[in-house]
């Protein structure tokens, strides 16, 4: 995969990446539906361990997203924050500043109850900053998607 055109804007520092992950609230998940792209916005949680990013998503127990992941687990994701539009004297001077993360990964549907409980706790911590605990019965009403990031 090619890198960014504006390489001076690329973020490599793990602490900066974590700041973006903590500030953002919506991840755009890119999937493949046959020969068509399909993107869905989702809440997420993450674990950064030894420089490796693992992302957890949750959703309904059935639907298009799960069908697509089962057919092709290769995914692309994007999330952004700090969106600030700016103006100029001419049209070409208008723009937006933002921070974002994009990457590829392999998605898997989590079946293990303990990992599902962990994923839900991580997701809620990322979204709210609060700690929550989940009982086994709560894990049965949602599907957890785990993205093992590749970059």
Q: Language-model segments: what does each one mean?
A:
Residues 1-22:
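Extreme N-terminal tail/first-helix region
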Residues 11-13, 23-28, 127-130:
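Short Pro/Gly-enriched beta-strand edge/turn motifs at strand-loop
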Residues 2-6, 83-151:
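Charged, gly/pro-rich active-site loop segments
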Residues 32, 43, 60-62, 80-82, ...:
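Histidine- and/or cysteine-centered catalytic micro-motif in compact active-site loops
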Residues 53-75:
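Compact nucleic-acid interaction/catalytic patches
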Residues 29, 75-79:
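Short conserved beta-strand and strand-loop elements enriched in small hydrophobics
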Residues 20-21, 68-69, 123:
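A generic structural signal for nonpolar/aromatic side chains embedded in well-ordered alpha-helices
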Residues 24-61:
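Short beta-strand segments
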């Amino acid at each position: 995969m090619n890198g960014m055109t504006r390489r001076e804007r690329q973020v490599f520092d793990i602490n900066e990446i974590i700041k973006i992950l903590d500030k953002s609230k919506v991840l755009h998940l890119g999937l493949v539906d046959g020969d068509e792209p399909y993107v869905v916005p989702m809440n997420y949680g993450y674990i950064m361990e030894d420089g490796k990013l693992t992302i957890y998503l949750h959703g309904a127990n059935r639907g298009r997203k799960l069908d697509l992941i089962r057919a092709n687990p290769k995914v692309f994701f994007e999330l952004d924050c700090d969106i600030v539009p700016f103006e100029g004297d001419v049209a070409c001077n208008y723009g937006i500043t933002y921070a974002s993360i994009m990457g590829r990964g392999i998605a898997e549907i989590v079946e293990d109850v303990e990992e599902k409980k962990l994923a839900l706790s991580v997701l809620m911590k990322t979204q709210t900053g609060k700690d929550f605990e989940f009982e086994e019965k709560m894990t049965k009403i949602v599907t957890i998607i785990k993205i093992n990031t590749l970059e």
